[in-house]
Amino acid sequence: MSAPQQQQQSQQKQQQHVRVVEQQQVEPAEAVTSSMESESISASKELTGLTHECGVFGAIACGDWPTQMDIAHVICLGLVALQHRGQESAGIATSEGKCSKNFNVHKGMGMISTLFNDDSMKKLRGNLGIGHTRYSTAGGSGVVNCQPFEVHTTHGALALAHNGELVNNESLRREVLARGVGLSTHSDSELIAQSLCCAPEDVSELDGPNWPARIRHFMMLAPLSYSLVIMLKDKIYAVRDTYGNRPLCIGKIVPINAGHGNNLDTPADGWVVSSESCGFLSIGARYVREVEPGEIVELSRSGYRTVDIVERPDFKRMAFCIFEYVYFARGDSIFEGQMVYTVRLQCGRQLWREAPVEADIVSSVPESGTAAAHGYARESGIEFAEVLCRNRYVGRTFIQPSTRLRQLGVAKKFGALSENVAGKRLVLIDDSIVRGNTIGPIIKLLRDAGAREVHIRIASPPLQYPCYMGINIPTREELIANKLNPDQLARHVGADSLAYLSVEGLVEAVQLKHRDAGDSKSKGTGHCTACLTGEYPGGLPDELSW
């Protein structure tokens, strides 16, 4: 597809998203909340540039039910560890494993710490449950789109939480509506849930619903992008799309006195599934493995098992989002057998090889660029020192009341450590540049503190294309890399020089561990670089309007 065609279709896709938000209906009381959240979200996007859509979590107790384990608190702590994946809304749904008519559900707008108190947690009784943190990309902002999403079927209740974004949302929506099923929101999660409520024509269900077959049918219709947790009365299904675009992993809850070994032979107190493994230790769980691309995993009180694996179309390579390593994931999470922090460290090393510069100290924009800065410092032999002090009490969703205060927003978030800065030549590492709104004020802050030179190094390639697979990346016109080359951007933000890590360098850093180990598994790996290269995975249909 030519560049003009991509740009035209990108604009069409953006218009589709605008129509989705315009069509969203809310009650008057919710409208006030939605308006406030909209202002807050806009400010967040302007300050932070990129936002992930969601984090999902599920937990189930083993052994006799009712369990002595407080499942709701386990899920709540799991969601706290995933709060970086979504700060707009959150929710938890639990099941006691007996009555299939209703689940215990609590969800709403806001952060985990404000949504879940003692009263709400007491109502979330159960032996299993799922949870969700959300930042909207499709469906709009508002209470009506909070997850988990619950539907009632002739076979009982079903609750679902989703991370990602359906690339063929419109065709799936038409298919569901053609069956006479009403959709009350524009959320992908409701669409998935309603799709699962209808049995495929070629599946016999004389003995009750065949949920794995229904899930497989949905996966054949929807190539990407999703990681799902689906709760029924007494079990949870963990599902990852066939391209493995979004992360999902399994953990084992072990007894408190189990120690810190691999605990393979230790009886499980329960099982968890999560977008990331970063919260496992805090809930007494141990990382087991990832849910494989196309895999359907069933979790029950007896343990977990693979019930089906759906193959990728035409045996194409998997397409795990490479920006999970760059920006979105927490540094202590594990993807593809390696810690995210280690990959970011390697990105910094590679960045020095590609873009060296004479300097006195290496530093970072806290905190996402810190690991790469350490890698740059180690490879170059230049001392690492902190030059920015972060104000942790300025939230990501701080509403900026005027243009002047908005421009000074960085001053609210950061202070300069002048003793480390004055008279020094600095290399400042950041993970990415989106619109270029933030880095300029930071450079000015450092120069005001006495920096002699400020050289910017970005530990990822230029962002040039939107993402419609669960990441809020703006239109091509808003991305600064499409307006200015590195030299022009350096002058624009007031830096002495600016350079990015190459696409090849990023892929090298991500795949280095497997290649050095001669891991045959690496032959089957692959990463989505669509936001960097414009090469979208999966042979996407025309209706996507890329």
From Swiss-Prot:
Highest taxon listed in the record's lineage: Eukaryota
Domain Glutamine amidotransferase type-2: 54-302
Residues with PTM Phosphoserine: 113, 120
Name under which the protein is recorded: Amidophosphoribosyltransferase
Keywords per UniProt: 4Fe-4S, Glutamine amidotransferase, Glycosyltransferase, Iron, Iron-sulfur, Magnesium, Metal-binding, Phosphoprotein, Purine biosynthesis, Transferase
Cytoplasm as UniProt keyword: no
Function: Involved in the first step (and regulatory point) of the de novo biosynthesis of purine nucleotides, where it catalyzes the transfer of glutamine amide to 5-phospho-alpha-D-ribose 1-diphosphate.
